[in-house]
């Protein structure tokens, strides 16, 4: 069923918004982050039952119900510890084996970073458990962030601590 052939009664009950979100998710317009070890988005959306089992076991509460009820990662709630409980709780075949990399997300620091405006801040470095963020001293200026992308595991610990929301996680596979 598409939005075009949605019965009038369901339209009036608000079903069009859920259906529209579902169609956008299936067309891979989704720009959020799925749980670690998730399969490609089109397969994920087709197989996920939106039961919420993965949400209830997430120890850091970063998994939330997103568009059309599908689980998404919100790093502003915390970081991913890669505990794998979401994978273990799911009864559907929507996850890769846990011996593979959990995802290809890496840190991206925007131009709103305080250090780029000559304001001292190192909260991202302080919060990074992988020590992937370092600061290079500048002669007569404020130290600038340097990211070791090989060390960054995409856990998102740096996101929550940033006072100006200058940090996001980007999927390197989508940028190739």
Swiss-Prot record:
SUPFAM superfamilies under this entry? 4Fe-4S ferredoxins
Quote the record's binding site residues for [4Fe-4S] cluster 1.
Answer: 48, 51, 54, 58
Domain 4Fe-4S ferredoxin-type, which positions? 39-68, 71-100, 119-138, 143-172
On assembly, the entry states: Interacts with the cytoplasmic NapA precursor.
Annotated residues for binding of [4Fe-4S] cluster 2: 80, 83, 86, 90
For this record, an example GO cellular component is: cytoplasm
Q: Which InterPro entries match?
A: 4Fe4S_Fe-S-bd, 4Fe4S_Fe_S_CS, Fe-S_Ferredoxin, NapF
Keyword tags: 4Fe-4S, Cytoplasm, Iron, Iron-sulfur, Metal-binding, Repeat
Q: What is this protein called?
A: Ferredoxin-type protein NapF
Cofactor comment: Binds 4 [4Fe-4S] clusters or perhaps rather 3 [4Fe-4S] clusters and 1 3Fe-4S cluster, leaving Cys-113 out of the cluster ligands.
> What is its biological role?
Could be involved in the maturation of NapA, the catalytic subunit of the periplasmic nitrate reductase, before its export into the periplasm.
Query: Which organism was this protein described from?
Result: Haemophilus influenzae (strain ATCC 51907 / DSM 11121 / KW20 / Rd)
- Pfam families associated with the record: Fer4_7 (PF12838)
Which residues does the annotation say bind [4Fe-4S] cluster 4?
152, 155, 158, 162
Q: Which NCBIfam families match?
A: napF
């Amino acid at each position: 069923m598409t939005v075009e052939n949605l019965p009038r009664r369901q339209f009036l009950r608000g079903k069009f918004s859920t259906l529209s979100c579902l169609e956008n998710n299936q067309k891979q317009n989704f720009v959020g982050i799925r749980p670690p070890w998730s399969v490609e988005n089109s397969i994920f959306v087709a197989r996920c039952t939106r039961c919420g089992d993965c949400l209830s076991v997430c120890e850091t509460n970063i998994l939330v119900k997103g568009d059309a009820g599908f689980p998404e990662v919100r790093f502003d709630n915390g970081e991913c510890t890669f505990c794998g409980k979401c994978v273990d709780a799911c009864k559907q075949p929507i996850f890769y084996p846990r011996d593979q990399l959990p995802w290809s997300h890496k840190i991206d620091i925007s131009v709103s970073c305080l250090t780029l405006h000559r304001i001292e801040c190192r909260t991202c470095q302080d919060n990074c458990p992988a020590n992937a963020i370092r600061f290079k001293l500048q002669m007569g200026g404020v130290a600038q962030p340097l990211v070791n992308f090989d060390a960054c595991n995409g856990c998102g610990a740096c996101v929550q601590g940033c006072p100006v929301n200058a940090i996001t996680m980007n999927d390197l596979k989508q940028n190739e």
